[in-house]
């Protein structure tokens, strides 16, 4: 009798399978009980779509609503395989273990992680369902790319079900320092789960080095000890007769598309309208973030408030726009954070604004893509001040939209993007005076200096786009077959 894992071998017909927590669609349940589907835009699907079409690709993920049907979906020529999650699954696996345990742990304990055995058990169970769905969809010898922190056990589970597959894993958030990761009660299980992959990818070499050390310490595996480079000099972990490759692959954006859209006449016109609606201030500062405690929105608001109070920023000719996309609205800590931020906005406007002319313009709602690009075109200074961020693509999006416009980027040192965007005004978000100095320098920079810096930033962003990121990872993954 064949081993249980072998029963699924070759049962699917997809040569390339992407596995992510979410499908690239938004599903909505209508009043009559039926469902509607619309395409969800994103850099990952944009980068992988040509490959998905060319290689009979499939995407495994959750459709976004509890108890959604598991029938395969064909959406705009893409083959999608939903994994159904119940309301309890969402509460324990997603809102619980993924976002109240892993998220804060991997973001340097900005808030305290919560360790619940029930959440962990559900995380294991849901990861198993994703692995089984992938095993059913993948053709013999297929390539599988697993995405992000919600699915860290899938590589090992899938390896046991389908040893014929070539499996890659990429972590889109920071991988924490060793001493923080060691707090995790299920630390060994996570590392062993990731070691089921043939290639484990991180944004930065530091994350790869942390993973190599933990693999040695927690599993006793032999690992390489030389430093890991960006898209080069890979680390290795010996797992039985397999060699797992470990690398750094900084993710990026579809920079050419953004560059093109930002030059569009209607977008430029809308950017002028935004400036007019704000009273044609001399300088517009912009923040664009998901409403999350890692993003440092409160830091930039406090810095801006103190600059106004100190008279280092003229309240009569400077405005700040803060776009905050709703996020995890049922989680208590996020509700409290939103209230704190809105209180800060109210304080600044009450102290420094005038009737009909607030100095901070705050929007707590999603903004259409073309409108967002118009904001990027309108803004003189972009504020990106996370306390910790794996990469931060907003910083790169702003740069891609600036073409002939100059401008300035204030960027937290604790973003992955800071390693690439060296011509930004870098600041430590934990040092308020440093953030204030960076904002003031960006506001007062010489126009020619601004154009020089922006040209350098744009060379980096336009040359290293999301397509190059995906190709670099998949080329390295393909090389593991011949290793």
Swiss-Prot record:
EC number: 2.4.1.15, 2.4.1.347
The protein's annotated pathway: Glycan biosynthesis; trehalose biosynthesis
One Pfam family named in its UniProt record: Glyco_transf_20
Keywords tagged on the record: Glycosyltransferase, Transferase
Residues engaged in binding UDP-alpha-D-glucose: 42-43, 290, 295, 393-397
Domain of life: Bacteria
Annotated positions binding D-glucose 6-phosphate: 22, 94, 148, 328
UniProt xrefs under CDD domains: GT20_TPS
GO BP of this protein: trehalose biosynthetic process
Enzyme class, broadest EC rank: transferase
Swiss-Prot/TrEMBL catalytic activity: ADP-alpha-D-glucose + D-glucose 6-phosphate = alpha,alpha-trehalose 6-phosphate + ADP + H(+); CDP-alpha-D-glucose + D-glucose 6-phosphate = alpha,alpha-trehalose 6-phosphate + CDP + H(+); GDP-alpha-D-glucose + D-glucose 6-phosphate = alpha,alpha-trehalose 6-phosphate + GDP + H(+); TDP-alpha-D-glucose + D-glucose 6-phosphate = 5-methyl-UDP + alpha,alpha-trehalose 6-phosphate + H(+)
Cellular component aspect of the GO annotation: cytosol
Gene Ontology molecular functions: alpha,alpha-trehalose-phosphate synthase (GDP-forming) activity; alpha,alpha-trehalose-phosphate synthase (UDP-forming) activity; trehalose-phosphatase activity
Function field: Probably involved in the osmoprotection via the biosynthesis of trehalose and in the production of glycogen and alpha-glucan via the TreS-Pep2 branch involved in the biosynthesis of maltose-1-phosphate (M1P). Catalyzes the transfer of glucose from UDP-glucose (UDP-Glc) to D-glucose 6-phosphate (Glc-6-P) to form trehalose-6-phosphate. Probably also able to use ADP-Glc, CDP-Glc, GDP-Glc and TDP-Glc as glucosyl donors.
Subunit organization: Homotetramer.
The protein's name: Trehalose-6-phosphate synthase
Organism phylogeny: Bacteria, Bacillati, Actinomycetota, Actinomycetes, Mycobacteriales
């Amino acid at each position: 009798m064949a081993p249980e894992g072998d029963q699924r071998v070759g049962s699917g017909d997809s040569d390339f399978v992407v596995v992510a927590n979410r499908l690239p669609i938004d599903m909505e349940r209508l009043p009559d009980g039926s469902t509607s589907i619309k395409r969800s835009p994103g850099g990952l699907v944009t980068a992988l779509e040509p490959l998905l079409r060319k290689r009979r690709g499939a995407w495994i993920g959750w459709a976004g609503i509890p108890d959604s049907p598991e029938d395969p979906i064909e959406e705009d020529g893409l083959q999608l395989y939903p994994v159904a999650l119940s309301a309890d699954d969402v509460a324990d696996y997603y809102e619980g273990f993924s976002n109240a345990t892993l998220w804060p742990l991997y973001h340097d304990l900005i808030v305290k992680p919560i360790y619940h055995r029930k959440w962990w058990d559900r995380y294991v169970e849901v990861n198993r369902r994703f692995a089984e769905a992938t095993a059913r969809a993948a053709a013999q010898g297929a390539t599988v790319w697993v995405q992000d922190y919600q699915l860290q056990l899938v590589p090992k589970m899938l390896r046991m079900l389908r040893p014929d597959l070539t499996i890659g894993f990429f972590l889109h958030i920071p991988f924490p320092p060793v001493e923080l990761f060691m707090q995790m009660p299920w630390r060994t299980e996570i590392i062993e789960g990731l070691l089921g992959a043939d290639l484990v990818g991180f944004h930065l070499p530091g994350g790869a080095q942390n993973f190599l050390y933990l693999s040695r310490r927690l599993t006793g595996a032999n690992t390489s000890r030389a430093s890991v480079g960006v898209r080069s000099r890979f680390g290795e972990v010996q797992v039985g007769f397999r060699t797992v490759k470990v690398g750094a692959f900084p993710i990026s954006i579809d920079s050419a598309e953004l560059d093109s859209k930002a030059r569009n006449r209607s977008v430029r016109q809308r950017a002028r309208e935004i400036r007019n609606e704000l009273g044609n201030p001399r300088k517009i500062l912009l923040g664009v973030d998901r409403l999350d405690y890692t993003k440092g929105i409160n830091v930039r608001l406090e810095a801006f408030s103190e600059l106004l109070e100190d008279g280092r920023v003229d309240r009569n000719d400077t405005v700040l726009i803060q776009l905050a996309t709703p996020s995890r609205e049922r989680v208590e800590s996020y509700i409290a954070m939103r209230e704190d931020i809105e209180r800060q906005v109210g304080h600044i406007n009450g102290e420094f604004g005038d009737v009909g002319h607030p100095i901070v313009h705050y929007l707590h709602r999603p903004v259409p893509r073309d409108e967002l690009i118009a904001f990027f075109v309108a803004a003189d200074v972009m504020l990106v001040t996370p306390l910790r961020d794996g990469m931060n693509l907003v910083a790169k999006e702003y740069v891609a939209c600036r073409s002939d416009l100059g401008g300035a980027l204030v960027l937290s040192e604790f973003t992955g993007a800071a390693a690439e965007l060296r011509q930004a005004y870098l600041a430590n978000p934990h040092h308020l005076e440093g953030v204030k100095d960076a904002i003031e320098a960006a506001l007062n920079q010489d126009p020619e200096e601004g154009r020089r810096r922006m040209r350098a930033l744009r060379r980096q962003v336009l040359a290293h786009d999301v397509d190059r990121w995906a190709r670099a990872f998949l080329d390295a993954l393909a090389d593991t077959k011949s290793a």
